[in-house]
Amino acid sequence: MATPVVFIHGLWLHATSWQPWVDLFREAGYDPIAPEWPGGPDTVAQARADPGAVAGFGVKDVADHYAAIIAGLPEKPVVIGHSFGGLLVQNLVGRGITAAGVAIDPVPIKGVLALPVSALRVASIALRNPGNRSKAVSLTAEQFRYGFGNALSAEESAELYEKWAIPSPGRPLFEAAFANFAPNSPTKIDTANATRGPLLLTSGSQDHTVPPAIVKATLKQYAKSPAITELRTFEDRGHSLTIDHGWQEVAQVSLDFLKQHSIT
């Protein structure tokens, strides 16, 4: 039986942006799916037309949503997530319900103190208005260019924005921003779990939304666990690395990591 793979997107990208990855992993012998977040419409057009469908959902809501999906699978899956999806991957890996995880440019979990200016600039899109906690928040093309497409040509960034950008709930950004002041923050991860599957963390050297300093600080959170945790940095790549012209390099590194640890 093929090992299931669950792809988890982050804020401002639709689940269908994973389709090239789904196809590649199926060709590699896995059984991949890319479910939407709770409330998420099936298409980009529907998501743009009804932003309220996702408003108000927080990290715990989304993590529990994916945990329920995993519970219905025939065996423990590999989970691969980008940005907030990378945080969700760590949540699910920490629960011990996955075979392995790949967290691509993951937003900071509770305990990570690094806060580069560029990351704060992106988060402020939602945080500047407390009312956004209960609303869906959209990016302008200019904001997408800074947060996702800064390592791309202006033309490619604009193309990706038009193809994949959607409104997303503001609540997760507030939960991540204030995690270190909240004892029961939903971004708290069981980083000490000694029996979990292997975890790969990645960063893009030019990422404005989740700069490498955040991912390096995340790796340190796992220092007390004997379980496998690895870090890979992709040079000259920004936050768009899962959807831009170089996505296959990131996907292949993910596949190689799984094969290296005999998860096929």
Each PLM stretch: what is its role?
Residues 26-48:
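Conserved alpha/beta-hydrolase
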Residues 208-217:
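Conserved alpha/beta-hydrolase "acid-adjacent" motif
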Residues 80-85, 89:
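Gly/Ala-rich beta-loop-alpha elbow adjacent to hydrolase catalytic centers
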Residues 195, 201-203, 207:
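Short beta-strand/loop motif that positions the catalytic acidic residue
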Residues 97-134, 174-181:
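Flexible "cap/lid" loop of the alpha/beta hydrolase fold
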Residues 119-167, 171-173:
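Helix-rich cap/lid subdomain of alpha/beta-hydrolase
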Residues 10-13, 83, 205-206:
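Active-site glycine-rich loops that stabilize anionic/oxyanionic intermediates
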Residues 228-264:
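Catalytic active-site module of serine/aspartate enzymes centered on a nucleophile-bearing elbow/loop
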